[in-house]
Amino acid sequence: MASKNTSVVLGDHFQAFIDSQVADGRYGSASEVIRAGLRLLEENEAKLAALRAALIEGEESGFIEDFDFDAFIEERSRASAPQGFHEE
């Protein structure tokens, strides 16, 4: 992978954060900290894109009917009751 030297301007807050990460030994250089942050941003953007696609798919799937929780429970109870069982 080819590298490109890019210059960025950071505020005091982010510069101090980068410096502390390097000083603590978590990263070997400011570039490593920036790359780690960019990887997280890239992962987050991919997750957001997948979520947006799922939302659109759900919206386009159409509206079936309102969900009736009580009817759902009743149906599940009937389905799980032993066959031939009749309450008297």
From Swiss-Prot:
Keywords: Toxin-antitoxin system. The keyword Ribosomal protein does not apply. Pfam families: ParD_antitoxin. Disruption phenotype: Cannot be disrupted, suggesting it is a functional antitoxin. No visible phenotype when the parDE1 operon is deleted. The keyword Iron-sulfur does not apply. It comes from the Bacteria. Gene3D superfamilies: Antitoxin ParD1-like. One of its GO terms (biological process) is regulation of DNA-templated transcription. InterPro entries: ParD, ParD_sf, Ribbon_hlx_hlx. One of its GO terms (molecular function) is protein homodimerization activity. Signal peptide: none annotated. Belongs to the ParD antitoxin family. Homodimer in solution, forms a ParD1(2)-ParE1(2) heterotetramer. PANTHER family: ANTITOXIN PARD. Antitoxin component of a type II toxin-antitoxin (TA) system. Neutralizes the effect of cognate toxin ParE1, but no other RelE or ParE toxin. May act as a DNA gyrase inhibitor. This is Antitoxin ParD1. It comes from Caulobacter vibrioides (strain ATCC 19089 / CIP 103742 / CB 15) (Caulobacter crescentus). The gene is parD1.
